[in-house]
Amino acid sequence: MANYVGVDLGATNVRAVAADGNGTLLGTAAADTPRGPTGIGVTEAVLGVVRGACAEAGIDPESVAAAGIGAIGPLDLAEGAVENPANLPDTIDRIPLTGPLSVLLDTDRVYLHNDTNAGVIGERFYSERNPDDMVYLTISSGIGAGVCVDG
């Protein structure tokens, strides 16, 4: 059975989970989001929690079939990076994500979304209710909203 990784990159914390194809949680890891000196430190923290979640799950990172990242913005989706995040120090101008994670996991199936939009997708397609219409709010280090209308 395939294994998957999910990453939550916020201004305060970075978290990762490893799960199997049934959605059974196999491992978790978390760390504080580095405050600098550059975005590479944040990238390394993401890779570290992914390694930690895989280790707790007892799986090799290279056995992961795909990964999803929900991250603070703004995002450069074409390059798979966070660009000049407002909630982090000015010295952090770019946080590369999909490229380094693709190398660690040995897969091109690494997907990046804004964290709030990822929440909307999760609630719409994977919650018990599967609501066609909703507003999803995040209130943390920043404030965000996602809307789903007519599915």
Where are the language model's segments positioned?
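Short loop/turn motifs at secondary-structure junctions and domain boundaries
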Residues: 8-10, 136-139
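Short glycine-rich, Thr/Ser-proximal phosphate-binding strand/loop in the N-terminal lobe
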Residues: 3-48, 81-84
